[in-house]
Amino acid sequence: MANSNRVTVIHTGYSSTTIEEKDENLPFVRANCSCVLVTGSKNIIVDTMTPWDTNLILLSLEANGLTPDDINYVISTHGHSDHTGNNNLFLKAKHIVGYCISVKDKYFLHPFDKGLPFEIDEGITVIPTPGHTADDISVVIKTEDMGTVVIAGDIFEREEDIEQPEIWRSCGSVNPEQQEHSRAVIANIADYIVPGHGPIFKVTDGMKKKLSQNLSSELHVYRYSLAQKYVEVGV
């Protein structure tokens, strides 16, 4: 059967490290995340932005012939407020927020912390990619038109952070070394990456080499074994 999975970026994320004038005596920067709709065998929304973006999400769903009740899974790549703000719209969906999988008061046990992927359906898999936070996840989508698309959340801030790693490091990382592992793993399996705060981009061989070259030999073994594990389960 042909793969019907389709990836639509309904909002392209952005971020700035420029500190603006104080508001209510607090300095601030501006950011919002990429929000992605996956349609096909399952309907999935990934990273639901802030609570002030409700209308944008509802209009985007309507433009794709969907309502919140048509969504099977709502996924937040991690628990920060710009990635979870409209999860409450999707009360008929299973929710995955970082390593936590839940419906109402049911919390499903899955060993993301052991490096094991969670398969939603054929060609749709959630993998653990910690680093930005302790329990980041990425969504791996196999498509006919784009190959393998990885929705990576803030493991990648934007394409430019491959050549300028100070970009992602300055945006916060609980474990930079672990985040480097995750970035290399994602690049190894992706044809396209949707970063947390920038446009979708195509992964080149040069990018893969760049992301791997600073890893120690021990981390290369880890990255290879983890990538092989994903291949074995069909990621």
Residue positions per predicted region:
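Zn-dependent metallo-beta-lactamase
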Residues: M1-S41, A187-I189, D205-K210, R223-V235
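Beta-strand-turn-beta hairpins that frame and shape the catalytic cleft
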Residues: A2-V7, T39-N43, P117-T125, T143-T148
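A short catalytic or substrate-binding loop motif that flags glycine-/basic-rich loops and adjacent residues
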Residues: F28-A31, P130-A134
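Metallo-beta-lactamase
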Residues: L59, N88-T133, D135-V233, ...
